[in-house]
Regions:
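Terminal accessory/targeting
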Residues: 1-85, 102-111, 230-240
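Homeobox/homeodomain signature
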Residues: 3, 10, 58-63, 127, ...
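Active-site beta->alpha N-cap acidic-glycine motif
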Residues: 48-154, 161-168, 172-176
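Active-site-proximal beta-strand/loop segments in catalytic clefts of secreted hydrolases
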Residues: 88-91, 114-118, 141-142, 180-184, ...
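Alpha-helical scaffold elements lining the catalytic groove of polysaccharide deacetylases
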Residues: 96, 145-171, 185-232
Length: 240
C-alpha cells in the first residue's frame, strides 16, 4: 500500500471569507524511484485564536492511483461537509510561494503543493521551506507541458523527471505520491501509468482561476461562491 497525507480543514463560510481577505492583502515578498509516504506535519502552537486551523489529517491509500476532484473523478471523495483541501500549483517561486507560506502559517493551516520540477531545481531552498512547514508535497511534471500533446514515453519522462527534481530539491527526500496533470488534461495511457506507479491523481472541485484575475477580492469572491454551492472540496490555486 502506498499512502500520503492530505490536509482537510473544517471551516465556516464566514471565517473563510475573513481569513482569505486577510491573506489576499499580504504582499508577495533516469526515472525517479516509486514515491514514498510524505511525513506527517509537525504539530505547532497556534497563536491566532481566529485561525482556520486544521480539522484533521487524512491518510490516503494511493494503491492503484485513485483520482480525486469531481471535475474529472466521481468515484472517490475523502472530504466531509464543510471541509476543503487547499492546493497550490506551479511553484516554488520567489515572493509568491513565500507569501503563501506566510499566509498559511498565520492561519495555522496546511496545504498540498504540486511544484514544477524545474522550478524546484531553481529554488530548492523554497522547496525545503514548504516541506519544513509541514505541508504535503506532490509533483506537477518537469516543465508543465500539456501531456496530452506528447507521446506516451515523453509523457512518462515528464512525470518521472518532475518527481526526481522535486525529491532532489527536498534534499533527496521522498516525494508524496500525489500528482496533478498540467492544465488538468489526463491522457488515459498516463492515468494508467500512474495507477501502476500507485500515484494518486488530484484534479479539483473548485478552480480559483486566480491566474485570470488581477484583484485578490475577485479570487476570494469566485472561490467563496463555489464553496457555498458545493459545501466542500479541493481548491486549486497557484504559487507562481
Amino acid at each position: 500500500m502506498r499512502s500520503a497525507l492530505a490536509i482537510a480543514m473544517a471551516i465556516s463560510m464566514s471565517a473563510a471569507t475573513t481569513a482569505w481577505a486577510q491573506t489576499a492583502q499580504t504582499p508577495a515578498p533516469a526515472a525517479a524511484p516509486a514515491p514514498a509516504a510524505a511525513p506527517a506535519p509537525a504539530a505547532a502552537k497556534c497563536d491566532n485564536p481566529n485561525a482556520l486551523g486544521v480539522a484533521r489529517v487524512v491518510e490516503i491509500d494511493t494503491t492503484g492511483g485513485p483520482g480525486f476532484g469531481f471535475e474529472h473523478f466521481k468515484a472517490y471523495d475523502f472530504l466531509r461537509d464543510h471541509e476543503v483541501v487547499l492546493t497550490f500549483d506551479d511553484g516554488p517561486w520567489p515572493g509568491h510561494t513565500t507569501a503563501v507560506l506566510k499566509a498559511l502559517a498565520e492561519q495555522c493551516t496546511k496545504a498540498v503543493f504540486f511544484p514544477i520540477g524545474k522550478h524546484a531545481g531553481w529554488h530548492p531552498e523554497i522547496m525545503k521551506q514548504v516541506a519544513a512547514a509541514g505541508h504535503t508535497v506532490g509533483s506537477h511534471t518537469w516543465s508543465h507541458k500539456d501531456l496530452s500533446k506528447l507521446n506516451e514515453q515523453d509523457g512518462k519522462d515528464e512525470i518521472e523527471k518532475g518527481i526526481a527534481a522535486v525529491g532532489i530539491a527536498l534534499g533527496n527526500q521522498p516525494v508524496g505520491p500525489f500528482f496533478r496533470f498540467p492544465a488538468l488534461r489526463h491522457p488515459p495511457e498516463l492515468v494508467k501509468y500512474l495507477g501502476e506507479r500507485n500515484v494518486a491523481i488530484f484534479s479539483t472541485d473548485m478552480d480559483s482561476f486566480d491566474f485570470k484575475m488581477r484583484k485578490p477580492e475577485q479570487v476570494i469572491a469566485s472561490v467563496m461562491k463555489k464553496l457555498e454551492k458545493h459545501g466542500k472540496g479541493i481548491i486549486l490555486m497557484h504559487d507562481f
